[in-house]
């Protein structure tokens, strides 16, 4: 019992990378994340895109930026991700 620590240990949080496709909302960006996988039977590489709404507290991400997202608690009805860092600014 003495092995308990006073600081709560965080669970593993999912991390995704994608491109900002919309920044028209206040403190929110829409990020398109591409998922590539091989078809189990035919072997073709398939690209699937998922769009996540992510929290951007400082409104610094713009359309075309490559960003890293991290999963967080639900911030609204559809927002469960937050922008951790901007990996590459749009040209």
Swiss-Prot record:
Taken from the record, one Pfam family name reads: Ribosomal_S17
An example molecular function term from Gene Ontology annotations: structural constituent of ribosome
Q: Which cellular component, as a GO term, is one annotated location?
A: cytosolic small ribosomal subunit
GO biological processes: translation
Key words, A-Z: Ribonucleoprotein, Ribosomal protein, RNA-binding, rRNA-binding
UniProt cross-references to Gene3D superfamilies, sorted A to Z = Nucleic acid-binding proteins
Instruction: Give the function comment from the record.
Output: One of the primary rRNA binding proteins, it binds specifically to the 5'-end of 16S ribosomal RNA.
Query: Subunit arrangement?
Result: Part of the 30S ribosomal subunit.
Concerning its family, UniProt says:
Belongs to the universal ribosomal protein uS17 family.
User: HAMAP family attached here?
Assistant: Ribosomal_uS17_B
Q: What's this protein's name?
A: Small ribosomal subunit protein uS17
Q: Which organism is it from?
A: Thermobifida fusca (strain YX)
């Amino acid at each position: 019992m003495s092995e308990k620590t006073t600081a709560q240990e965080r669970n593993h949080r999912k991390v995704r990378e994608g491109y900002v496709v919309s920044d028209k909302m206040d403190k929110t960006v829409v990020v398109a994340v591409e998922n590539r996988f091989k078809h189990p039977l035919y072997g073709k590489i398939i690209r699937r895109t998922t769009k996540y709404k992510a929290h951007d507290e400082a409104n610094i991400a713009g359309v075309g930026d490559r960003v890293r997202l991290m999963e967080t608690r639900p911030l609204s009805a559809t927002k469960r991700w937050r922008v951790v860092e901007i990996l590459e600014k749009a040209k």
